[in-house]
From Swiss-Prot:
Basic and acidic residues bias locations: 118-133, 149-164, 294-303
Segments passing through the bilayer: none
Subcellular location: Cytoplasm
Name of the top EC class for this enzyme: transferase
Modification Phosphothreonine, positions: T187, T207
Name of the protein described by the UniProt record: Serine/threonine-protein kinase PAK 4
Segments of this protein annotated with the region Linker: 25-322
Chain's role: Serine/threonine protein kinase that plays a role in a variety of different signaling pathways including cytoskeleton regulation, cell migration, growth, proliferation or cell survival. Activation by various effectors including growth factor receptors or active CDC42 and RAC1 results in a conformational change and a subsequent autophosphorylation on several serine and/or threonine residues. Phosphorylates and inactivates the protein phosphatase SSH1, leading to increased inhibitory phosphorylation of the actin binding/depolymerizing factor cofilin.
Bias (Pro residues) ranges: 281-292
Start and end residues of each CRIB domain: 11-24
Pfam families per UniProt: PBD, Pkinase
InterPro entries: CRIB_dom, CRIB_dom_sf, Kinase-like_dom_sf, PAK3-like, PAK_BD, Prot_kinase_dom, Protein_kinase_ATP_BS
Length: 593
């Protein structure tokens, strides 16, 4: 009855304790310092939306700034082995912007300017990819993105500030974590996701002509990818073997081996598809490797030369002479976004600041200026001016107080009147852009910004491409993983149809709150997009027949059968579109949460 009390177990203090980690907060930089590498991607205030992937054809060795969120692999997987790629994925770095270079990236071997757009012609010899950064999480904006990584819901819900913060309103620091662009250290080639044994036969887009109308993909060491006659690259998608027997098709694609360059070695890579397809008729013959050197070692464009070229398309002067009170509201895939006040009128504007020395592909900065300047439309964000301030490109544009559509799709539920209103505005902008040969390549909710009265505007033109009669298709891997079209992932030549697929994914986003496969790592999601049937709505029972029919016209695997923007503007579903004011209640609902 009066038994002894059990003796309380005493736990000693830790022995041999060492203080190895000291974390602090830099008030000037407004960021944590000394964080363990594993924590950096969890606690940074920067956005966690997927960023867009950028074609890895000219990734060079870099020294990134603060880790961001675009995923790049350190090397391409050999023989398309899924195991190798997934092992490599464990060691990828994660950056949330276009890698924020401390040095300028390699210049394009041959560049052209058409309708104000500058695009890389061919990939220069590559340097070793960046090895810095933390382990890649399955995230990917966007970039991306942007890239990139993933927005899988781990820990507190953090949806990354979209690389598309653009001129939108301030984004919360804490948002659902979106996988990461599309986008942003060597981009993994999503095609190498599968074992190199098969590519499902009968896929309509797989019969696409393999003309090399964009710069050819190259291996991590600057070596041309081995191509199957009608299929993707060996490091891309599922070439059955990597033996020398597959080399001739490689040369047919415009990436000849050293011995078969011949007199056309110096021609631009935008030769018409007919020439590229006719190449196999010439049997491969051994030859001296000498003629290859000019293509492998193009003359580098210095930072000063690039800056001088950019100076030709921007406005003279310094915006700080008439702008005050710069306040950072977000971080995008290529730089930061601030709001500023016009001294004379007190009007708020958005200013996107992009450091020339911290870009993965500098030439894409021309898109930021040229597209918004030359293709003005009521559903495209209006650009006021652009300037070179030191080594930064500043783009001054309208400030959209409503923020990004991402906030609405994440935290509210849209009805079909509101979904149709967004689709109508986006399609009106795309119809104009596509008619001019401009492909956006990063359509998603992060790229859609809203005015205070509910008007919808398309933004983020930094990853655009131009097609024309001379260059009818593109082949760069650019976009945000979950929104990418199957043919783009498969590295097949593509055109404006990829924007239509991405819009279809965005419709699913507006209905379900997230894109398909969003709980999967980006590489796995890209494999599923490439190999599976078109994704379906989770809440299919909530969709009307007209919405289902509209979605069926967007998400068609065969790009030739996919509807165009002009055709979709006549679809019955868009007759449901409400006025811009119908979007306002959603913005209010989001603000009151």
């Amino acid at each position: 009855m009066f038994g002894k009390k059990k003796k309380r177990v005493e736990i000693s203090a830790p022995s041999n304790f060492e203080h190895r980690v000291h974390t602090g907060f830099d008030q000037h930089e407004q960021k944590f310092t000394g964080l363990p590498r594993q924590w950096q991607s969890l606690i940074e205030e920067s956005a966690r939306r997927p960023k867009p992937l950028i074609d890895p054809a000219c990734i060079t060795s870099i020294q990134p700034g603060a880790p961001k969120t675009i995923v790049r692999g350190s090397k391409g997987a050999k023989d398309g082995a899924l195991t190798l790629l997934l092992d490599e994925f464990e060691n990828m770095s994660v950056t949330r912007s276009n890698s924020l270079r401390r040095e300028s990236p390699p210049p394009p071997a041959r560049a052209h300017q058409e309708n104000g757009m500058l695009e890389e012609r061919a990939a220069p010899a590559r340097m070793a990819p960046d090895k810095a950064g933390s382990r890649a999480r399955a995230t990917g904006h966007s970039e991306a993105g942007s890239g990139s990584g993933d927005r899988r819901r781990v820990g507190p819900e953090k949806r990354p500030k979209s690389s598309r913060d653009g001129p939108g309103g301030p984004q919360e620091a804490s948002r659902d974590k979106r996988p990461l662009s599309g986008p942003d250290v060597s981009t993994p080639q999503p095609g190498s996701l599968t074992s190199g044994t098969k590519l499902a036969a009968g896929r309509p887009f797989n019969t696409y002509p393999r003309a090399d109308t964009d710069h050819p993909p190259r291996g991590a060491q600057g070596e041309p990818h081995t191509m199957a006659p009608n299929g993707p690259s060996a490091t891309g998608l599922a070439a059955p073997q990597s033996s020398s027997s597959s080399r001739p098709p490689t040369r047919a694609r415009g990436a000849p081996s050293p011995g078969v360059l011949g007199p056309h070695a110096s021609e631009p890579q935008l030769a018409p598809p007919a020439r590229a397809l006719a190449a196999p008729a010439v049997p491969p013959a051994p030859g001296p490797p000498g003629p290859r050197s000019p293509q492998r070692e193009p003359q580098r464009v210095s930072h000063e030369q690039f800056r001088a070229a950019l100076q030709l398309v921007v406005d003279p002067g310094d915006p700080r002479s008439y702008l005050d009170n710069f306040i950072k509201i977000g971080e995008g895939s290529t730089g930061i976004v601030c709001i500023a006040t016009v001294r004379s009128s007190g009007k708020l504007v958005a200013v996107k600041k992009m450091d020339l020395r911290k870009q993965q592909r500098r030439e894409l900065l021309f898109n930021e200026v040229v597209i918004m300047r030359d293709y003005r439309h009521e559903n495209v964000v209006e650009m006021y001016n652009s300037y070179l301030v030191g080594d930064e490109l500043w783009v001054v544009m309208e400030f959209l107080e409503g923020g990004a559509l991402t906030d609405i799709v994440t935290h509210t539920r849209m009805n079909e009147e509101q979904i149709a209103a967004v689709c109508l505005a986006v399609l009106q902008a795309l119809a104009v852009l596509h008619a001019q040969g401009v492909i956006h390549r990063d359509i998603k909710s992060d790229s859609i910004l809203l005015t205070h009265d509910g008007r919808v505007k398309l933004s983020d033109f930094g990853f655009c491409a131009q097609v024309s009669k001379e260059v009818p298709r593109r082949k760069s891997l650019v976009g945000t993983p979950y929104w990418m079209a199957p043919e783009l992932i498969s590295r097949l030549p593509y055109g404006p149809e990829v924007d239509i697929w991405s819009l279809g994914v965005m419709v699913i986003e507006m209905v379900d709150g997230e894109p398909p496969y969003f709980n999967e790592p980006p590489l796995k999601a890209m494999k599923m997009i490439r190999d599976n049937l078109p994704p379906r709505l989770k809440n299919l029972h909530k969709a009307s027949p007209s919405l289902k029919g509209f979605l069926d016209r967007l998400l068609v695997r065969d790009p030739a059968q996919r509807a165009t923007a002009a055709e979709l503007l006549k679809h019955p579903f868009l007759t449901k579109a409400g006025p811009p004011a119908s979007i306002v209640p959603l913005m209010r609902q989001h603000r009151t949460r």
